[in-house]
């Protein structure tokens, strides 16, 4: 199972942790894993490459995990954009959980 934990401070989503394999299918044929990976890469690329922010990203292949943390202080436009991206990602993963409850878990942690 893949566990996705969204981190927040108050109402601000500060980042997320994704860990584990979904186990839906074998590597290369796992549509749940592909959906998760695609969303994570889209958000990370948008935050760091398009918006030019310096979000901290850590990848550990040993336990199939990736984490992203937003910088502490962002301008109003960047903050609003990042919150919209992360909220959309949270909703998307909740919908995936509804479709594949045995393969993805979504948590929120303050």
Which residues does each PLM region occupy?
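N-terminal intrinsically disordered, cationic/polar leader segments
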Residues: 1-31, 41, 45-110
């Amino acid at each position: 199972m893949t566990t996705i934990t969204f981190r927040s401070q108050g109402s601000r989503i500060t980042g997320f942790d994704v860990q584990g394999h979904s186990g839906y299918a074998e590597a290369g044929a796992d549509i749940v894993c592909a959906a998760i990976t695609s969303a994570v890469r889209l958000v990370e690329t948008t935050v760091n490459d398009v918006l030019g922010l310096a979000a901290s990203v850590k990848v550990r292949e040993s336990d199939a995990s990736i984490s992203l943390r937003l910088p502490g202080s962002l301008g109003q436009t960047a903050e609003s954009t990042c919150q919209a991206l992360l909220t959309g990602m949270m909703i998307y993963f909740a919908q995936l959980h509804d479709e594949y409850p045995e393969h993805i878990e979504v948590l929120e942690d303050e």
